[in-house]
Amino acid sequence: MFSGRLPHLPELVVMIDAELLREPPPSPFLGHDEFDPEGLLSGLLLHKFVRLYRYADNGPPPSVRPEPPPEERPVHTGWVVLDPPNPNHPGRRVVFFREAPTSYTTSAVIGNAADVAAADTTTDAYRALEAVGASERRRADGLAEQVAEQGVHADVYVTRREYLAKATRRMNRETTVCTPEEALTLVSLYLRQQGEFIAAKPDRGSEFVMNRGLFYWVAARELLPEAWRWFAACAQHSAKVADDRMTYLGQSLLQRVARALEARDAVHVSSNQPQDNDLKDEALANTDEVLVLLMGAVDVTARVAHKAAGLPDDDVRHAGWQKQQWLRELGGQAPRVAELFVPESQLSDVITVLRLLRNSVHGVALQGLSLMEDNRPMRNLVGLPQDDEAKLLEAIARLGGCKRWSVVTHPRPLGSIFEPATLVDILFEHVIKLLNAVMSRTPVEDLEGVHLAAEHLGPPSARGPNSTWDPFEEWTRLSIRWQLGF
C-alpha cells in the first residue's frame, strides 16, 4: 500500500544548446578521457523521465535530417526551432518535435526581452567584440532564453552563453538557466528523487545503476579519502582486542556523513520549488538533520583521537574539539592534531558555526521566515540563533564572509538570515575538510594491533574476474562527486 509508485514527479523538460550535448555520450570504459561532467550530463539527459530538446541560433545543422513533414513543413526530432520573423505577427513561432513522426508542437515567443538584452551594456559580456556584434550576441542570448521559457516551457536551460551568465536581472522566472556542471547537479537530484541512482548512462538502453544506500555510501567514501587509513586502523584494533566498539565508532562517522548527504538533498529539493509554509518547515527539519549528523560525525573523530592518543577511556565523554581542557590534554600526546583547533583557526571557526547552529536543537529552534522583495518570488529563509548571533557572524566572517554563506543582517526583529541550501552546502564543504584534516593527523597507527599497508590507504580493487564494474572505481566515485556538486 505504501510502496513507492514511480515516477511521482512530472517529466523534467530540458533545453540545451546543441554544441554542449555529446552524442553519443562518452562511456566511462571506452571514452574514459572524455568522461567528464558534460559527458555524464549528456547521458543522464537520455533518461526516460527527461524530455530533451536541442537548440541552436541558426537551427539544426544540415547533418540533422528532417522527418517527413506531417503537414506543410519538415520537423527535426529532438529539436526546437525558431521560425524567422513574420511581419504579419508580433511574435516568433517556435516548433518543437520529440519522437512521434506524425505530429509536432508549435508555440510562440512574445515580448521585447531580446531587444532589452541587445541594449543591455551593464555587463562586460562580449566586450571583446565591436558594439554591433556584441549587441547581436546579447540579442541571440536573450531570444534563446525566451524560447526556453515561453516556447518550450523548459524547467532547465543548459547553456554557456556569456550574457546569460552575467546578466543580473532578466525577464525569465520559470526556467532555471545554468551551465552543464550546474545542470548535472539538478538533473541528478531530480532523478534521485525518482529513485534513480545512476553512475553513468552511455546510451538510452544501458546504464550503471546503484541502490540509494550504496550511492551515498560511495559518496561518503569519495569525499573522505583519509577515512580509508583511519577506518582500517579502527577495524584492525577491534580485531586485535576482540571488541567491536572501535569498528562501530569509525563506521558511525561514515554512516552519518552518508545520511547527512541524503538530508542535504532534501534541503535542496525543498528549496527548488515555488515556496510555501510547508516547504519552509521541510527545509528547517532537514537543515536540523544535517547539523545533527555532521556534528555527530565530528564528535566521532574526537573520540577516536582520544583513544589513539592513549588518554583514559573513562574520560572519553569529555572528548570534543570545542573543549579547551580536553584539547590541552590531547596536545600533550598528539600535538599535530590538537594544534588544528587553536582559537580562531579555520577549523576552530568551523566547529563554532556547526556547534552553535546544532545547539539550536537543545533550545529555541531555528526560525524560518518568508520574504518577498521587489516583486520577486517568495523565498524561505532561516534566522541565525539570536543568543549566538555575534559569535556566528565573527566565525563566518573569517570563513569567507557573510555573502558566501548567504547571510544578510537586517535590523531587529529580522536579524541575520540565510538561505538554508546555500549555508548547508558551504558548511558541508568545510566539515568535509575538517574531517579529512583530523583523520590524516590522528595517530591511529599507535592503536594496539594496527599494521597498515598500502592497500589500506585507498579504495579496494573489488572487481572480480567475472565482474564488469566496481562501484569504488575512480570514474564511479568522480561521477557521484560531480552529481552531488562537490
Model-predicted segments: where are they?
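Short internal beta-strands
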Residues: 40-64, 297
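Mature extracytoplasmic or otherwise solvent-exposed domains
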Residues: 245-248, 252-265
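Amphipathic alpha-helical interface elements
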Residues: 256, 263-313
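Acidic, Ser/Thr/Gly/Pro-rich intrinsically disordered interaction regions
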Residues: 2-11, 18-36, 46, 61-119, ...
